[in-house]
Amino acid sequence: GQSAQLFEKAFLAYQKVYEQFPDSGRVGDAVAKMAAFYYQKEDYSRAIDVFENVLSDHPDANFLDVILFNYGRCLYKLKRKPEARKRFEQLINDYPESEIASEANKIVKALKKAGF
C-alpha cells in the first residue's frame, strides 16, 4: 500500500545518508532505520548484516544501544538465542544508563532461565 511505498522511500533516503556520510555520527540513526525496515519485513538476516556492519565499521555511531537491542531481537527471531543473549548483555554492559538496558536485562534473565 501507500505506507509501504513511503517506507521504501524513507529506507532509500537513509541508505543514501549511510553511503554518503559513512563517518558521520548520523550513521547510527540511518542504520537503525534501515534495520527497522528489514525487521518490519521479517528479513532478519539482512537486518543482522546491517547491524554487524555498523558494529564493526562504526563503533562510535549514535544509537548503538538501540542497534544492539534490535540486533538481539533479530537473532532471537532466528532462534539464535545464545547469540541474542550476548548482544543483550553487551548492551547492558556498554550502556547501563540506557532506557532499554532494563528491558534487555529482563530478556537476559528469561533466556538464562530457559537455559540459553
Residue ranges of predicted features:
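Acidic, polar-rich low-complexity tracts and alpha-helical solenoid repeat scaffolds
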Residues: 1-116
